[in-house]
Amino acid sequence: MDQKILWDCHMHSSFSADSDTPMEEMIQTAADQGLTGICFTEHFDPDYPDTPENLDFSLNIPAYRQKLESLADAFKDQIQVNFGIELGLQPQLAESFSDLLKEVPFDFVIGSSHVVHGYDPYYPSYFEGRKESACYMEYFESILENIAAFDEMDVYGHIDYVVRYGPNQNRQYSYGRYKEILDEILRTLIRKNVGIELNTGGYHYGLGEPNPCVNIIRRYRELGGEIITIGADAHTPDKISYAF
């Protein structure tokens, strides 16, 4: 018998630069779906490169916290609403992130790789003039750099995020092709007691699998990993609990 997933632990609202949805709309939709709880994980990506859309991934944390706590109280009889953050990891940000987590009592912290040496794979410029495989490898190497600098997150987000935006997506990608470095990432996370996220956004992007892919999740368990959270990475109400 299939078990229903009752929590969505990765979502965004208009407090994130890439979402226009009011927080209350996200909460109401999740409550209407019958979820037990949700966790907002608004983007905080200092040192984010310039983008064609001029996106600002800074985060007004006091305003975000105040709004969330107010709405969590208003919806307390319908759904539990937790206070999280998605940190856009880069090695030079480690100290400032550590200071932030000492100051602000987040319920849940995702650490994610969005920027690799000044480029976000979301944009084609990351892949221009290079082999797709080299771009994927650079992305995975950057995860190891980030973990070495900072390990205070609860989980590492969408470990193969880069595949969503590759020219061929996952048609030429597999766990086996990058096994050595992916195993190093997984072993390092396990040693540091950092979990991984099963991000169902991969289905939304047409991969036919979550991020990371199923074989990475299986390998994480084979290596002894025990911490797995599930989130849809929703930026709009229709993507809440997507493919759960």
Regions found by a protein language model. Give the residues of each.
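Charged helix-capping and loop-helix junction motifs
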Residues: T21-E24, Y173-D183, E209-R218
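Anion (oxyanion) recognition and catalysis
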Residues: A31, I190, R221-E222
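His/Asp/Glu-enriched short active-site or ligand-binding loop at hydrolase and phosphoryl-transfer sites
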Residues: N193-Y205
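H/E-rich (His + Asp/Glu) clusters that bind or coordinate divalent metals
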Residues: Y203-F244
